[in-house]
């Protein structure tokens, strides 16, 4: 086991992150698990003031205030190493209320948006960078906001004739005392990623919806549970790179623990599905990406129902993870794009909206 203490310094007088220690247990294919440890304050920056003449200055924005903070920080470590290997000057910024001041102070050429969740994935940072006229990676304001909100993205999918599971929206103020839908069903927060807050309610579960406390906002989507195969498509700069299947090994659904712990799921890439279905997924994913006007990397999630072989779209993620267990880097590697080159392709697509 190797322990890494991450202590990034954004500027000579500004300490950005000093209280996160991430345990990385390496096997041949990458990280075994991601675990938070007690705060420490003695780590040393790995990318402070690394400057390569003739190369652009990249502000790597990560961390932030969302429930996905730790995933963002782990992603940023790999991204930082790739950017340094490519010869860029890298300055890390932990997203906070003073983000505009920090960006104005360091004047980067490009912002690499490595955030997940609120303020980074929902279009807020994109909007600020549009105002500041700083090119940035990943999708713009409308694309990010639309993809991040499950109510609006579902409406958009259905408008564009993309098949989705039956669902309803439940508000906390509705004070529902009975089951909102016949079991089994899925409870999904409106604006969370990494499967945070998702619950699957099966027939045998001891669960009373009247006692549900809405931990992630005053609205949830209740969606019919579909038993089937998890299929994921990586899209980079408008081109679908491949399809990966997730085979669950321990938990009943693809939850946070399964996503970020080695041994909880097996990734099959390319997905062992018929060629016509494989090609259909690539085409459908490119359609979703392009009509949503996305930019840079994205991941589109589907379910293939066991009983009917019917395909259901789940969502598009405009800020997919870049951890060693993340899906987009794995599919990119299958397509012949190593992690460093993947980051370079993301940087090449950086722009701001006028």
Swiss-Prot record:
Pathway: Cell wall biogenesis; peptidoglycan biosynthesis
Domain ATP-grasp: 154-348
Binding site for Mg(2+) 1: 301, 315
Subcellular location: Cytoplasm
Residue positions binding ATP: 181-232
Co-factor note (free text): Binds 2 magnesium or manganese ions per subunit.
One GO BP annotation of this record: regulation of cell shape
Gene3D superfamilies assigned to the protein according to its UniProt record, in alphabetical order: 3.40.50.20, ATP-grasp fold, A domain, ATP-grasp fold, B domain
GO CC list: cytoplasm
UniProt keyword annotations, A-Z: ATP-binding, Cell shape, Cell wall biogenesis/degradation, Cytoplasm, Ligase, Magnesium, Manganese, Metal-binding, Nucleotide-binding, Peptidoglycan synthesis
Keyword Magnesium: yes
Molecular-function GO terms, alphabetical: ATP binding; D-alanine-D-alanine ligase activity; metal ion binding
Pfam families listed in its UniProt record: Dala_Dala_lig_C, Dala_Dala_lig_N
Keyword Protease set for record: no
First-listed, main subcellular location of the protein, grouped into a coarse class: cytoplasm
Catalytic activity reported: 2 D-alanine + ATP = D-alanyl-D-alanine + ADP + phosphate + H(+)
Family classification: Belongs to the D-alanine--D-alanine ligase family.
PANTHER family: D-ALANINE--D-ALANINE LIGASE (PTHR23132), D-ALANINE--D-ALANINE LIGASE B (PTHR23132:SF23)
Role according to the record: Cell wall formation.
Protein name as annotated: D-alanine--D-alanine ligase
Organism from which the protein derives: Rickettsia canadensis (strain McKiel)
Gene: ddl
């Amino acid at each position: 086991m190797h322990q890494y203490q991450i202590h990034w310094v954004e500027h000579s007088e500004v300490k950005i992150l000093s209280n996160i220690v991430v345990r990385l247990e390496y096997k041949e294919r990458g990280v075994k698990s991601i675990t938070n440890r007690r705060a420490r304050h003695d780590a040393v920056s790995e990318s402070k003031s690394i400057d390569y003449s003739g190369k652009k200055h990249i502000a790597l924005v990560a961390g932030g205030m969302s429930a996905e903070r730790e995933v963002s920080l782990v992603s940023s470590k790999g991204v930082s190493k790739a950017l340094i290997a490519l010869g860029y000057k890298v300055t890390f910024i932990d997203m906070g209320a003073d983000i505009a001041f920090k960006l104005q102070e360091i004047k980067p050429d490009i912002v690499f948006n490595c955030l997940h969740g609120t303020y980074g994935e929902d279009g807020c940072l994109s909007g600020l960078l549009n105002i500041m006229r700083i090119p940035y990676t990943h999708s713009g304001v409308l694309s990010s906001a639309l993809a991040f909100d499950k109510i609006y993205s579902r409406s958009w999918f259905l408008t564009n004739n993309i098949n989705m599971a039956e669902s309803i929206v439940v508000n906390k103020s509705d004070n529902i005392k009975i089951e909102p839908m016949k079991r089994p069903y899925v409870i999904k927060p409106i604006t969370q990623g990494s499967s945070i807050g998702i619950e699957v309610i099966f027939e045998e579960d001891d669960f009373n919806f009247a006692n549900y406390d809405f931990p992630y906002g005053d609205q949830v989507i209740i969606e019919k549970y579909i038993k089937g195969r998890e299929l994921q498509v990586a899209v980079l700069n408008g081109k679908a790179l491949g399809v990966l299947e997730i085979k669950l090994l321990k938990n009943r659904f693809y939850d946070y623990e399964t996503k970020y712990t080695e041994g909880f799921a097996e990734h099959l890439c390319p997905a062992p599905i018929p060629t016509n279905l494989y090609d259909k997924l690539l085409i459908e994913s490119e359609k979703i990406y392009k009509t949503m006007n996305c930019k840079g990397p994205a991941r589109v999630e589907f379910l293939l129902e066991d009983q009917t072989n019917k395909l259901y779209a789940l969502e598009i993620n405009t800020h997919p993870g870049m951890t060693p267990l993340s899906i987009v880097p794995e599919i990119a590697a299958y397509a012949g794009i190593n992690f460093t080159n993947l980051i370079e392709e993301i940087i090449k697509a950086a722009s701001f909206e006028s």
